[in-house]
Every structure is written in C-alpha cells, then in structure tokens.
Amino acid sequence: MSVVSTTPASQDACYISLLGLAEYFRTSQPPNIKKCIQCLQALFTFQPPSKVEARTHLQMGQVLMAYTCNIDLARRHLEQAWSIAEPLMNFDDVKFDTASLLAQLHLKTEQSSHAKAMLRRAVELSQNNVYWHCKLLLQLSQIHASDREYSLASDLLAVGAESAEEAGATYLKVLFLLSRAMILMIERKTNDVLALLNSAGQIIDNNIPNPHQKEYLKVFFLVLQVCYYLALGQVKTVKPSLKQLQMSIQTIMAPNWPSDETIFGGNQLEMFVWLPKEQLYVLVYLVTVSHSMMAGYMDKAQKYTEKALTQIEKLKQQEDKSILSVFKVILLEHIVMCRMVMGNRELAIREIAAARDVCLAVPHRNLLKRHSAQLHCLIGLYSMSTSFFEHAERQFLVCVNETTERDLKLFANLNLAIIYLRTKREADLKQILDAVSTENTHTYSSQALMGGFYYVQGLHAFHKNSFHEAKRFLRETLKMANAEDLNRLTSCSLVLLSHVFLSIGNSKESMNMVTPAMQLASKIPDIHVQLWGSAILKDLHRMSKDAQHEKEAYANHVKYSENLIADQRKCVQSAHHELINWFQGNPPVTSNSSLNPAVTVPTTETSTSALQQPQQPAAQFGQFY
C-alpha cells in the first residue's frame, strides 16, 4: 500500500498545482467556474496552514461573488476568511481585502449597517497600513454618503486627509480634500466648501510635481468648482472655470496622454482614482449640459446630451459600470426639461420613460430610490404643460414629500404655486408662497430659483391687478437674471412686464419689453414666451393701427398654437402618457412600438405648456424648468 506524502514541500506543490488549475478554469473561454471552485475546495482537504486557508476562503468568496448568484456561500467563505485572518499579523492584504469584499456583499443584500460595522473594525485595525487605512476610509465614507449620513462621511474624509498628510502622500491628501468638498457641497455648507476648494487648489498649483496627476486633480477640482457655481445659479460667474475644465479634459483625452495605469501605478499611495478619464469625459459633458440649460441655450444642451449619451453607450459595451446609469439618468432629466421649454412634450415623456427604464434596470431599485422624486417632478412638469393640473399637483406633492434636497423642493413648490394661480386657489397659493419665503429667507439658495420665486410673486400681483407691485417683483427678477445671464428667466420676466405695461395702457414700454423678450425667446428657443409675446405684439400693432405687423404677429401666434395642438394630440395618444397616473411604488412599464428613446434627434416642432386659443394670451403662465 502506498502512502501519500505530506511533507511541506509536497503540500506546497499541491497548493500551487490546484491554484494553477483553478486559475486555468477561471480564465478559460468560456470560464469553467464549477471546476475552478472544485480545485479551490480541494485545497482544504490538505488541512493547509492558517494563512493559506484564509487566502483560499477569500479566493472562493471572490469567485462566487464575481461569477455566481450564490451570495450565501460567498458570505460564508468570506466570513471564514475574516475570522482566520483578523488576528494574524503581517497579513494585511488578505485581511483587509476580505473586509472590503464582505462590506460590498452586505451592500448587495441591502445590509448597510453590517457593511459599516465591518469597515469600522477594518479601519481600526489598519491604522499602521496607510494604503489600506485610506482605502477603507474612502469605502466607508461612500456608504455613509449613499445613506445620506453626510456629517459622518465628511468626518471620515477629514481623517483620511490627515492620514495622507502624515504619510507625506500629497496627491492622496488632495483627493480626500476634494471628496470632502463634494460632501459639504451636498450639505450646502457654502463657506466650508470654498475654504476646502481654495486649500486644495493651492496644493494642486504648488505641491504636485507629477504633471499628469496635477492635470487629473485639476479636472476634479474644476468639476467641483463648476458644480458649486451652478448650484448657486451663477451661470455667468462659472464661465471661466467651465472653459478651463473643457480645456483640461481635452488634454487628458489626447491620444498621447498616458494611461491611468501608467500615471497611478507607480506608488501604492497614488493608486487612487476618483473616476477614470473616460468617465470624467462624460461628466464634463454633463456639467456642460447643465450650464447650457440654465443659461437658456437649449440647442447646445441637446447637442451635448446626444454626444454624452453616445459616449455612455460605448463605455457600457466595454464594461457596464453602475455610474454610467447614474450619468444617463441625470442627462435624460436635463434633456427632458429642455424639450419642454422648446415645446416638444411628446419627446419629453418618451425620455422620462427612458429614464424610468434606466432606473428600473439597476438592481435593488437603488437608482430609482435616489431619482424617484426627480421623476415625479418631471412628470409634474409634463402634466402641467399638457393641462392635466390635478395630476401635476399630485406629482409635485409626491416630489416635495419624497425629496430631502432643498432646491428640488423649492423648484416643485414654485410650480405648485403656478398651478394654484392657474386654478384660482388663492388660499393654497398664499400658504405656499409664505412657506417658500420663510424657508429661504435665511439660506443662500440658487439665484435662478430665487429669481423664479420673485417671478411667481410678480405673476401673482399681475393677476390681482396690483401692477405696481408686479413691476417691483419683476424688476428684482430681471436684476438677478441679468446679473448671471439667466436668459430664460430674463425672457419670461420681460414678456410679463410687457403684459403689465399693456394692461395699464403704456404701449411704448410694453413694446420696449416684448421686443427683447421675443429676441431671447427665439434664441433659446422658448415656445412659451413666443406664444405669449406674439399675442402681445398682435395687440400692440392693432393699437398702433399697423395692420401688416398685426397680421404677421397673429400668423405667428396661430402657428405656435397649431404646433401646440398637434403635439398635445401626440402626447395623449402616447402609451407613456399613462405615467401621469404614477404616484407611488415602482413606475408602470409603458411602451410604444415606434420608440427609440436613448438618443433622440432634435426636432424643430414646437408647442406650449398649456392649450390656449390664439385670442387668450393672458392665460399663458410658463413653468420653471
């Protein structure tokens, strides 16, 4: 009878052979995961040393997580790996890799408290290993941020910045500073954000010797700076930063630029990347779309959205990263608002449906949870623009109740105010205007939204025939809009001011207001202002007995109205129109046989936000998107 040798040398040979076989089966085309797992499982029959056993359990967990749906078995192997590795010295890679993977697994099963507890313990144990300490701090702060525990996330990032500084890792310190600035921006801690951005900016300029890392950090810094200004509605102020950002991303995307692996692979403490350059490229498109939309350049916003969506589809074919779905939803949310400004509401509801599909495709409905309030708000705008006011009101109320974002709440409330104005609900209107005024008096909100608030008050005063009060509010709106080149707000204010002057018989001032309003509206283009302005022009030309110009203005007004009616007909016939009845839970799945929603071609067809007869311009109100 032969005896199997159990000498250390022969055991090592068995381990190496089995690991080699496991890797062979894993990398086969197609992978043979069953045999890979069998090879790894066979290692345990040799009663390997603790470190080999822990590493093998980790490998089993990695394979099961990556290639199977057997979450429970993956968890058991990772928990065994952790229980063996936790007390062992000089075994950091296996120990902390296991902790990191276990946290990811807990998140997959929606147990974020377990993930946080696991990472907190790992952070505590990793204090003598700067690389793992910082990596685990970033992972833990990300989970807290996802759970909207922003103060905890910010504190962890501050600890990371200190750890990086103590280790002399300047690049890593700046990453922590910028990440913390991003969290503080979400918390609307304006002064703290500015202080952090200034501090990080000085380090980037003076203390990052590697030019490629410097350019990369500059892109991160400029993205945050642009987002900071846009969040405050400072569309004009942001222009130099946005231009600089666009130039920096072109530098990084140039063919001769080194790969991310080359730039960040030389030093362990530099192996941290906020986003790979291909994703940064999409992000720069996204902030450019946001700027174009806020500035009132709808054609530009459409053009950049289509380019960004094309780039996202290319990246998804290479590797379908979850952040690409986030980018896609945000882009669709922006383009939906552009479509409605231009009067293409049937296209808008298609793209709302496309955003819904992206959200529903993400596991555990995580993306839907984060964007449900925005979708309700968009459907509210669509319902409002197609004169389904009861549906619009309910959608905005759902949005207000679901969201924790102050600006989104203000945005929805302003549109609710317009609905109450249209439907002559004076008590509800007063209540909402008082609430908005109280909530935003002592806080620094977006200049665009506060300008919108003054506009709604001006509109309210106009409908009470308080023309002096209306002029006062609208001049305040114009002052804010002109200061930051908020073209759409400017055109809306001018056309309403024109109507105020028309109502008090001052035709000269009315003409002085409506002329630039129409010029801006055609540049945007904003069908709502064009419809309203053409009606005012028709009346002004009739008063001055200019029959030719009166006829032209009337023809334009009829054209806008007919486009509106045609688009309205398409809207109510669309299967996606059913979304106006979604008020809770998962949105209904709707489909149109002719639908190609992802990347859509701009259309020149226009309509307006409410069905109006050409003879009734006074009922036109507009919306705030």
Swiss-Prot record:
Cell compartment(s), UniProt: Nucleus, Nucleoplasm
Keyword set, alphabetical order: Cell cycle, Cell division, Chromosome partition, Mitosis, Nucleus, Repeat, TPR repeat
A GO CC term attached to the entry: chromatin
Zinc-finger among keywords: no
Extent of the TPR repeats: 96-129, 451-484, 491-524
Database matches in InterPro entries: MAU2, TPR-like_helical_dom_sf
Keyword Cell division included in the entry's annotation: yes
Residue stretches spanning the membrane: none
Region (Disordered): 600-625
Record's compositionally biased regions (Low complexity): 612-625
Biased amino acid composition, Polar residues: 600-611
One GO BP annotation of this record: maintenance of mitotic sister chromatid cohesion
Function in brief: Required for association of the cohesin complex with chromatin during interphase. Plays a role in sister chromatid cohesion and normal progression through prometaphase.
PANTHER family: MAU2 CHROMATID COHESION FACTOR HOMOLOG
Description of how the protein assembles with itself and partners: Interacts with Nipped-B to form the cohesin loading complex.
Membership in a protein family: Belongs to the SCC4/mau-2 family.
Name of the protein: MAU2 chromatid cohesion factor homolog
Species per Swiss-Prot/TrEMBL record: Drosophila mojavensis (Fruit fly)
Species classification: Eukaryota, Metazoa, Ecdysozoa, Arthropoda, Hexapoda
